[in-house]
C-alpha cells in the first residue's frame, strides 16, 4: 500500500490571520493579529494612516530592507436594501461573478457579525438563454432572513462589508484550502521571517516588515508604506498562479506546481540584482525555486514599491496557489515554509550599507 502523506501542522499565526475578516479598507481584525504576534518583538511598531502595519528590527541597521505582504482580502459591500429586506452589494476587489451565488457570507457590522447567503434566481426559473449568462451583480442579493427593510436596517447598514464564510482546512498531505490565502500567506511569511530574524542571528540591515492594506483595490497601502519605510531594497511576497491543474496552457502561463517551491519573478518589475541574490540564497539554503517571467508591472505591491520616491530595487516571491480569487484557494504549506526560509536567508545575506544597482 502507498505510504500515507502526513499533514504538517499549520502555524497558529497563519490560521489566526486566515480567521481574521479583513476586506480591503476594513482590515482591523488582521491588524490585531499582526500586532499580537509581532509588536512585542519589534524595536519599533506603527500603523500608518492607510492601515498598514510597520514592524522594525535594527533601528540603526543599513541597508533598509522592506518585506511586504498584504493583509486585505476580497469582499462585498452593501449598497442597497430593498423593501423585502434583501441586501444588494458591490464587490471589493476582483471577483469571478460565477462564484458568488449560493455562498454563506458573514457581514461585519458595528453590532457584530450577521450571517447571510448570497442568492439569485434558481436555474429552474430561467429561460434557456438566461441559463448561459453570468448574472450581473444587481441580479444577486444577500438573504439575512429579514422579514422587511425595517428589520434588515436594524441589523445591517449601507456600507457594511462582507466576506465569504469559508474556513481553513487541511486538504491532503501538505496541501490546505482556505479563503484569502491571497494574501494572508504573504503577510504571514514576511512577519514570520521578521520573528525568526528577531529571535536568531540578527542581520546588519534594518528590516521593516510591512503588512500592507488595500492591495486588492489598487496597491494603495504599498504606495504609502513604501514612502514611509523609505527602503534601499524591498521584497514583496504574494500568491502566484499554480498551473498544475487540467485547464492551464503552459505555453501561455508557464509551468508552476504546488510543492515546487517559491516562484521568483524576472521582468521589468523585478530588479535583476535582487533576483540573482534571491536565486543564490535559495541555492545556498537548498530551497527549490521556480522562475516566472513577467514583462510588465505585476499585480502585486511591487508595482507601487518599485517606483516609490527615487525608485526601489525590488524582488518578487510568489507562493504557488490554485483557484485564485475564489472562496477555496489551495496551497502547499511546504512552499510557504520555504518562502519564510528564503526571506530570512536574503536578509542575512545583506552586507552593511549594501546597495543594489
In which residue ranges do the predicted regions lie?
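N-terminal hydrophobic/helix-forming segments and targeting peptides
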Residues: 1-357
Amino acid at each position: 500500500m502507498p505510504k500515507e502523506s502526513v499533514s504538517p501542522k499549520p502555524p497558529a499565526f497563519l490560521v489566526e490571520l486566515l480567521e481574521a475578516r479583513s476586506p480591503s479598507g476594513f482590515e482591523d481584525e488582521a491588524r490585531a493579529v499582526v500586532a499580537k504576534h509581532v509588536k512585542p518583538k519589534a524595536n519599533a511598531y506603527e500603523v500608518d494612516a492607510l492601515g498598514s502595519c510597520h514592524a522594525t528590527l535594527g533601528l540603526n541597521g543599513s541597508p533598509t530592507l522592506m518585506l511586504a505582504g498584504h493583509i486585505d482580502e476580497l469582499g462585498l459591500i452593501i449598497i442597497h436594501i430593498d423593501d423585502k429586506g434583501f441586501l444588494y452589494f458591490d464587490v471589493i476587489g476582483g471577483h469571478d461573478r460565477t462564484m458568488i451565488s449560493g455562498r454563506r457570507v458573514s457581514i461585519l457590522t458595528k453590532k457584530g457579525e450577521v450571517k447571510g447567503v448570497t442568492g439569485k434566481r434558481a436555474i429552474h426559473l430561467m429561460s434557456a438563454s438566461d441559463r448561459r449568462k453570468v448574472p450581473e451583480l444587481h441580479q444577486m442579493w444577500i438573504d439575512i432572513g429579514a422579514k422587511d427593510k425595517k428589520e434588515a436596517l436594524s441589523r445591517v447598514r449601507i456600507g457594511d462589508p462582507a466576506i465569504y464564510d469559508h474556513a481553513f482546512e487541511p486538504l491532503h498531505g501538505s496541501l490546505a484550502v482556505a479563503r484569502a490565502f491571497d494574501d494572508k500567506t504573504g503577510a504571514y511569511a514576511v512577519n514570520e521571517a521578521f520573528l525568526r530574524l528577531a529571535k536568531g542571528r540578527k542581520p546588519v540591515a534594518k528590516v521593516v516588515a510591512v503588512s500592507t492594506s488595500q492591495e486588492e483595490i489598487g496597491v494603495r497601502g504599498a504606495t504609502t508604506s513604501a514612502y514611509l519605510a523609505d527602503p534601499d531594497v524591498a521584497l514583496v511576497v504574494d500568491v502566484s498562479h499554480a498551473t498544475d491543474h487540467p485547464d492551464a496552457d503552459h505555453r501561455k502561463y508557464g509551468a508552476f506546481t504546488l510543492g515546487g517551491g517559491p516562484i521568483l519573478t524576472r521582468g521589468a518589475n523585478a530588479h535583476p540584482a535582487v533576483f540573482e541574490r534571491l536565486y543564490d540564497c535559495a541555492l545556498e539554503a537548498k530551497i527549490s525555486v521556480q522562475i516566472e517571467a513577467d514583462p510588465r508591472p505585476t499585480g502585486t505591491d511591487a508595482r507601487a514599491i518599485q517606483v516609490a520616491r527615487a525608485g526601489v530595487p525590488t524582488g518578487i516571491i510568489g507562493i504557488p496557489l490554485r483557484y485564485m480569487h475564489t472562496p477555496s484557494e489551495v496551497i502547499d504549506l511546504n512552499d510557504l515554509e520555504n518562502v519564510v526560509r528564503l526571506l530570512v536567508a536574503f536578509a542575512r545575506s545583506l552586507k552593511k550599507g549594501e546597495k543594489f544597482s
